Amino acid sequence: MVYEVHIPAFPLNQFIESFVYYMDYNPAHTVDRFLPDGNTYIVIDLTDYPKFIYDNNSLKEIQSCRNVWFSGIRTNYITIPSGRDSEMFVINFHKGKTYPFVEMPMNELTDYVVDGELVMSTEILNMRETLLELI
């Protein structure tokens, strides 16, 4: 298993809390539930198969996520895959500091996970291709 956390230097550290990269993580459980914590994330999936968001009660798939997506502030918990067999790069933002990177008001993204192409600049979206070239 690989799990790396990088704290960016100035000026990115004013906005980004950390970069997280992981692969070959294989927990025994299949789903995770994340409580609302006021954070926002850009998730870059480095695999070719979709990840899902599940209904919190029935655990039925309610949304598919591919390549790059943005996860807004939550007011309720979210149920997602545990990360088994995933390879991801996650950008964790400081609370309230996402605005330079997402081209949409944050209040419109509360409780939503949206395709990166809908809310992010081309430069952010191109990060996935750059990361794939590096690994």
Annotate each predicted stretch with a short phrase.
Residues M1-I135:
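Alpha-helical bundle regulatory/interaction domains
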